[in-house]
């Protein structure tokens, strides 16, 4: 009832609502709760790109959404306010408007001098005060609010250095505005922002902090002053996301990866962990990917587990992992009757001949082991998640459909693709964003071609979207005699012009300190940042096979400039290639997605199967 307007943020007691108008914060009472509905302006310094709005670049005159968050006391709010005024513009053009129009947005490149400045703002709606917290420590630092204690006395947050290799866990007293540094962590070469995890318990008296200080992600129990009380988990496996916490029982339920032998290390397995001492109890016994949902009491949970080759089971279990009741059984008989077949799992070695890589293989429905099929690798480099499916699904990014044309289709992991296999595995690609996954993909295909006589290792294709598009183009230009055809969609081919946070974290950025003297001889320190990455444009000249480049011309994530630069490099090298620009499309292709898929199918059929019928395609309905 109360949240019918998305731009309003209601207080927990529903007495107040806060919103943004013309970049400033406003509050008023909820008339349905008997409160005064007079609008009160809380701030006056909000401007475009230094706003209190969710979208700091908005030019809306009316009410808009804010990222501000209420505290439990329904009095205080907090917000990370972003100052983007010095950022440079980026553009896309919508050619489908009546008069083609320019869309301008702020965008940071790796190594930029002027980047977003983050402020932590505390608002008191009763006292009508807005205060900026003094949290400055590092230039261009990132701020990540975590939680507020139940008594609304303290807000916990993380601040991270621009180079991503240092982080502080801090608290701020909402009454005095005093900031306290609790835990300082140095993590070289970087602390993965997608794998971090902190739990604040008992109003800050207990802190569960995840760290990779041993080379493996594990949890450590600190007191409220930052003193380490005990290690909770350890060993050569990864403790991951927390599923539930029983504060009275002093127990944590969390996912773990790679602890159990002969089980894919990417599978989510559930474990029971004690807060006050080290040790884990496995709760997942079935070989599969587990997703759990605990009941409020933490006495029971629902466990849905499956594999790509095993249908889901949905079980009610107790908190000791014992099955009580199967709740439901999916019915996919229609899929089987239509000829659908489960994909198959496989394991190969990485190019180091040591590391196991897990993959999935799709075959045609009419597969004949006496025939020989070209192979297509569907790729994504990571490094913040692995792209190989682990759960049962009928929707697999067109892999099943592609296989029906007469291909063996695979998705295989590679070193550096996921944080769930330990720090050494995950950081494999640091400083080498373009090349790190390529050798493993090539070597995996070579092993499969030797293992299975039905795979033609001389007819190899590769396809990917976004980072996968970047990887597909890099692969065919790095190993031009191996990959014969590649479809590269919306690829970030030149990471010098891609997302700053992505490039500086996963490829690395070097902080350069310089001492500057003013006219009076006073010295101050200035910081600059150097970013070095290898773009695909440097290797475009190596292309021998067939390459299709695809982009949406309204893509504000991976700007079409990436694809245009790659195309220009190919033109300058005198290379023949295919290119599809989808008008009006962003990073996804929307209503044109099926059109793109058909283009891709015909491209691979022509260049890997020798099927040229698509060259003579026509619309049989055109004369109706």
Label every PLM stretch briefly:
Residues 147, 152, 289-624:
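Serine-hydrolase catalytic core recognition
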Residues 34-69, 78-132, 322-333, 387-398:
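Predominantly five- to eight-bladed beta-propeller fold
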Residues 30-33, 124-128, 174-177, 223-227, ...:
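Short loop/turn segments that connect beta-strands within beta-propeller blades
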Residues 36-39, 128-132, 178-180, 227-231, ...:
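Predominantly a core beta-strand signature of beta-propeller blades
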Residues 2-18, 27, 48-76, 104-112, ...:
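Conserved beta-propeller blade repeats
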Residues 22-28, 87-92, 117-119, 164-170, ...:
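Structural motif
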């Amino acid at each position: 009832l109360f949240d019918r307007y998305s731009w309003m943020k209601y207080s927990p007691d529903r007495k107040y609502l806060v919103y943004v108008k013309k970049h400033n914060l406003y509050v008023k009472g909820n008339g349905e709760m008997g409160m005064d509905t007079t609008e009160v302006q809380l701030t006056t310094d909000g401007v475009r790109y230094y706003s209190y709005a969710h979208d700091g670049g908005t030019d809306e005159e009316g009410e808009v959404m804010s990222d501000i968050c209420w505290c439990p006391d329904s009095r205080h709010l907090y917000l990370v306010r972003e100052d983007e005024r010095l950022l440079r513009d980026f553009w896309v053009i919508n050619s489908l408007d009546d008069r083609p129009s320019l869309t301008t947005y702020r965008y940071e490149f790796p190594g930029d001098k002027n980047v977003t400045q983050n402020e932590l703002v505390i608002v008191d709606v009763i006292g009508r005060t807005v205060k900026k917290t003094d949290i400055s420590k590092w230039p261009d630092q990132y701020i990540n609010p975590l939680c507020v204690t139940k008594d609304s006395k303290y807000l916990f947050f993380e601040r991270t250095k621009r180079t991503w290799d240092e982080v502080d866990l801090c608290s701020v007293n909402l009454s005095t505005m005093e900031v306290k540094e609790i835990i300082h962590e140095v993590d070289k070469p970087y602390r993965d922002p997608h794998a971090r995890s902190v739990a604040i318990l008992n109003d800050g008296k207990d802190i569960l902090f995840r760290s990779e200080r041993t080379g493996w992600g594990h949890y450590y129990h600190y007191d409220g002053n930052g003193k380490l009380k005990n290690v909770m988990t350890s060993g050569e496996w990864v403790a991951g996301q927390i599923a539930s916490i029983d504060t009275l029982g002093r127990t944590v339920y969390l996912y773990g990866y790679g602890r159990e032998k002969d089980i894919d290390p990417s599978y989510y397995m559930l474990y029971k962990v004690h807060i006050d001492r080290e040790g884990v109890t496995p709760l997942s016994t079935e070989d599969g990917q587990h997703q759990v949902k605990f009941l409020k009491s933490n006495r029971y949970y629902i466990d849905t587990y499956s594999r790509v080759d095993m249908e889901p089971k949905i079980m009610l279990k107790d908190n000791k992992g014992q099955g009580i009741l199967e709740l439901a059984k999916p019915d996919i008989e229609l899929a089987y009757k239509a000829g659908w077949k489960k994909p198959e799992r496989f394991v190969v070695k990485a190019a180091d001949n040591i590391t196991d890589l897990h993959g999935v293989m799709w075959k045609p429905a009419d597969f004949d082991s006496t025939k020989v099929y070209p192979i297509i690798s569907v790729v994504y480099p990571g490094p913040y998640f692995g792209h190989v499916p682990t759960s049962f699904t009928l929707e697999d990014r067109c892999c099943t459909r592609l296989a029906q044309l007469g291909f063996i289709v695979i998705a295989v992991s590679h070193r550096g693709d996921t944080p769930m296999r330990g720090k050494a595995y995950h950081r494999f690609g640091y400083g080498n964003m373009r090349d790190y996954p390529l050798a493993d993909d090539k070597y995996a295909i070579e092993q499969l071609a030797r293992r299975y006589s039905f795979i033609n290792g001389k007819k190899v294709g590769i396809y990917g979207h976004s980072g996968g598009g970047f990887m597909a183009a890099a692969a065919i230009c790095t190993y031009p005699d191996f990959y014969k055809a590649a479809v590269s969609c919306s690829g970030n081919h030149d990471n010098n012009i891609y997302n700053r946070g992505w490039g500086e974290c996963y490829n690395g950025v070097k902080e350069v300190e310089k001492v500057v003297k003013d006219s009076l001889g006073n010295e101050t320190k200035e910081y600059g940042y150097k970013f070095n990455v290898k773009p695909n444009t440097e290797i475009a000249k190596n292309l021998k096979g067939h390459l299709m480049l695809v982009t949406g011309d309204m893509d504000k994530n991976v700007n079409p400039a990436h694809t245009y630069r790659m195309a220009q490099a190919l033109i300058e090298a005198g290379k023949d290639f295919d290119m599809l620009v989808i008008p009006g499309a962003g990073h996804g292709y929307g209503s044109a997605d099926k059109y793109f898929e058909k283009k891709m199918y015909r491209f691979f059929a022509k260049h890997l199967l020798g099927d040229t019928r698509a060259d003579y395609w026509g619309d049989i309905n055109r004369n109706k």
